[in-house]
Protein backbone atom coordinates (compact mmCIF):
# COMPACT_ATOMS: atom_id res chain seq x y z
CA UNK A 1 0.00 0.00 0.00
CA UNK A 2 1.37 3.38 -1.00
CA UNK A 3 0.02 6.69 0.22
CA UNK A 4 -3.67 6.82 0.99
CA UNK A 5 -5.43 4.73 -1.70
CA UNK A 6 -8.98 5.46 -2.77
CA UNK A 7 -11.19 2.43 -2.12
CA UNK A 8 -12.20 1.37 -5.63
CA UNK A 9 -14.10 -1.65 -4.27
CA UNK A 10 -12.42 -3.79 -6.94
CA UNK A 11 -10.80 -6.17 -4.44
CA UNK A 12 -13.08 -8.60 -2.64
CA UNK A 13 -12.20 -10.58 0.47
CA UNK A 14 -9.33 -9.98 2.86
CA UNK A 15 -6.28 -9.82 0.62
CA UNK A 16 -3.21 -7.91 1.74
CA UNK A 17 -1.47 -5.52 -0.67
CA UNK A 18 2.33 -5.63 -0.98
CA UNK A 19 4.18 -3.45 1.49
CA UNK A 20 7.67 -1.91 1.38
CA UNK A 21 9.54 -5.06 0.31
CA UNK A 22 8.18 -6.08 -3.07
CA UNK A 23 9.24 -9.40 -4.60
CA UNK A 24 10.43 -9.23 -8.23
CA UNK A 25 9.93 -5.48 -8.65
CA UNK A 26 12.27 -2.57 -7.96
CA UNK A 27 10.62 0.39 -6.25
CA UNK A 28 11.03 3.75 -7.97
CA UNK A 29 9.83 7.24 -6.92
CA UNK A 30 6.82 7.17 -9.28
CA UNK A 31 6.15 3.42 -9.47
CA UNK A 32 8.35 0.40 -10.04
CA UNK A 33 10.37 -1.53 -12.63
CA UNK A 34 11.36 -5.08 -13.52
CA UNK A 35 14.53 -6.19 -15.33
CA UNK A 36 13.34 -8.56 -18.08
CA UNK A 37 15.21 -11.39 -19.78
CA UNK A 38 15.00 -11.62 -23.59
CA UNK A 39 12.52 -14.53 -23.40
CA UNK A 40 10.12 -12.88 -20.93
CA UNK A 41 6.55 -12.46 -22.15
CA UNK A 42 4.12 -9.86 -20.79
CA UNK A 43 0.40 -10.68 -20.69
CA UNK A 44 -2.52 -8.65 -19.46
CA UNK A 45 -3.95 -5.12 -19.47
CA UNK A 46 -7.39 -6.32 -20.55
CA UNK A 47 -8.86 -5.53 -23.95
CA UNK A 48 -6.11 -3.47 -25.46
CA UNK A 49 -4.31 -2.71 -28.69
CA UNK A 50 -1.55 -4.81 -30.27
CA UNK A 51 -0.96 -8.53 -29.68
CA UNK A 52 -1.23 -10.83 -26.68
CA UNK A 53 2.44 -10.23 -25.75
CA UNK A 54 2.48 -6.61 -24.58
CA UNK A 55 6.27 -6.33 -24.74
CA UNK A 56 7.67 -3.52 -26.90
CA UNK A 57 5.00 -0.85 -26.46
CA UNK A 58 3.75 1.78 -24.01
CA UNK A 59 0.22 1.39 -22.65
CA UNK A 60 -1.70 3.97 -20.65
CA UNK A 61 -4.34 2.64 -18.34
CA UNK A 62 -6.87 5.42 -18.26
CA UNK A 63 -10.46 5.40 -19.29
CA UNK A 64 -10.66 7.25 -22.60
CA UNK A 65 -13.53 7.50 -25.02
CA UNK A 66 -11.63 7.38 -28.31
CA UNK A 67 -13.55 5.58 -31.09
CA UNK A 68 -10.47 5.16 -33.34
CA UNK A 69 -8.74 2.00 -32.10
CA UNK A 70 -5.54 1.96 -34.13
CA UNK A 71 -2.15 0.33 -33.51
CA UNK A 72 -0.49 3.63 -32.64
CA UNK A 73 -2.77 4.31 -29.64
CA UNK A 74 -1.57 3.83 -26.08
CA UNK A 75 -4.94 3.25 -24.41
CA UNK A 76 -8.52 2.25 -25.02
CA UNK A 77 -11.68 2.90 -23.01
CA UNK A 78 -10.96 0.44 -20.18
CA UNK A 79 -8.44 0.43 -17.36
CA UNK A 80 -7.15 -3.04 -16.48
CA UNK A 81 -4.09 -2.71 -14.27
CA UNK A 82 -3.30 -6.43 -14.19
CA UNK A 83 -0.20 -7.93 -15.80
CA UNK A 84 1.57 -11.30 -15.85
CA UNK A 85 5.30 -11.70 -16.42
CA UNK A 86 6.14 -15.16 -17.77
CA UNK A 87 9.77 -16.19 -18.22
CA UNK A 88 12.74 -16.28 -15.84
CA UNK A 89 10.16 -15.66 -13.11
CA UNK A 90 6.42 -16.08 -13.47
CA UNK A 91 4.26 -13.76 -11.39
CA UNK A 92 1.43 -11.31 -11.74
CA UNK A 93 0.65 -7.94 -10.26
CA UNK A 94 -2.45 -5.81 -9.91
CA UNK A 95 -2.45 -2.08 -9.24
CA UNK A 96 -5.65 -0.97 -7.56
CA UNK A 97 -5.75 2.67 -8.58
CA UNK A 98 -8.48 4.68 -10.36
CA UNK A 99 -6.14 7.16 -12.07
CA UNK A 100 -3.60 7.01 -14.87
CA UNK A 101 -1.05 4.17 -14.87
CA UNK A 102 1.58 3.93 -17.62
CA UNK A 103 3.10 0.57 -18.56
CA UNK A 104 6.34 0.94 -20.53
CA UNK A 105 6.69 -2.70 -21.56
CA UNK A 106 10.20 -2.57 -22.97
CA UNK A 107 9.53 0.30 -25.37
CA UNK A 108 12.02 2.80 -23.95
CA UNK A 109 14.44 0.07 -22.82
CA UNK A 110 13.84 -3.36 -24.37
CA UNK A 111 14.90 -5.15 -21.18
CA UNK A 112 12.93 -3.06 -18.67
CA UNK A 113 9.27 -3.10 -17.69
CA UNK A 114 8.59 0.26 -16.06
CA UNK A 115 5.25 1.08 -14.44
CA UNK A 116 4.47 4.69 -13.56
CA UNK A 117 1.52 5.63 -11.36
CA UNK A 118 0.23 9.22 -11.55
CA UNK A 119 -0.05 9.55 -7.76
CA UNK A 120 1.36 7.53 -4.92
CA UNK A 121 -2.06 6.51 -3.62
CA UNK A 122 -2.51 2.90 -4.73
CA UNK A 123 -2.50 -0.70 -3.59
CA UNK A 124 -0.14 -3.15 -5.29
CA UNK A 125 -0.90 -6.87 -5.18
CA UNK A 126 1.76 -9.44 -6.15
CA UNK A 127 0.28 -12.74 -7.34
CA UNK A 128 2.57 -15.76 -7.39
CA UNK A 129 1.63 -19.03 -9.05
CA UNK A 130 2.87 -22.10 -10.87
CA UNK A 131 1.74 -20.87 -14.30
CA UNK A 132 0.04 -17.90 -15.97
CA UNK A 133 -3.25 -19.84 -15.79
CA UNK A 134 -2.84 -20.32 -12.03
CA UNK A 135 -2.09 -16.60 -11.64
CA UNK A 136 -5.24 -15.69 -13.59
CA UNK A 137 -7.32 -17.94 -11.31
CA UNK A 138 -5.85 -16.23 -8.25
CA UNK A 139 -6.49 -12.81 -9.79
CA UNK A 140 -10.15 -13.75 -10.30
CA UNK A 141 -10.32 -14.64 -6.58
CA UNK A 142 -8.83 -11.24 -5.79
CA UNK A 143 -11.31 -9.18 -7.84
CA UNK A 144 -14.31 -11.50 -7.80
CA UNK A 145 -16.50 -12.94 -10.53
CA UNK A 146 -16.53 -11.43 -13.99
CA UNK A 147 -19.31 -9.03 -14.79
CA UNK A 148 -21.89 -9.75 -17.46
CA UNK A 149 -20.81 -9.41 -21.07
CA UNK A 150 -21.96 -6.23 -22.78
CA UNK A 151 -25.00 -6.68 -25.02
CA UNK A 152 -23.63 -4.45 -27.78
CA UNK A 153 -21.25 -6.95 -29.41
CA UNK A 154 -23.87 -9.71 -29.19
CA UNK A 155 -26.55 -8.07 -31.32
CA UNK A 156 -26.66 -7.33 -35.03
CA UNK A 157 -26.17 -3.66 -35.92
CA UNK A 158 -29.07 -1.95 -37.67
CA UNK A 159 -28.98 1.13 -39.83
CA UNK A 160 -30.98 4.13 -38.68
CA UNK A 161 -34.53 3.90 -39.97
CA UNK A 162 -34.28 0.18 -40.77
CA UNK A 163 -37.05 -2.06 -39.56
Predicted regions and their residues:
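Catalytic and substrate-binding clefts that recognize carbohydrates or anionic sugar/phosphate headgroups
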Residues: 1-151, 158-161
Amino acid sequence: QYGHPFDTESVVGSFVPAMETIPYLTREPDGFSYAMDPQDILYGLGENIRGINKRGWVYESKCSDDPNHTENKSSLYGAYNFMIVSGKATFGFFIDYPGKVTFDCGYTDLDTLRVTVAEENYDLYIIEGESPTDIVHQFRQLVGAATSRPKGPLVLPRAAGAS
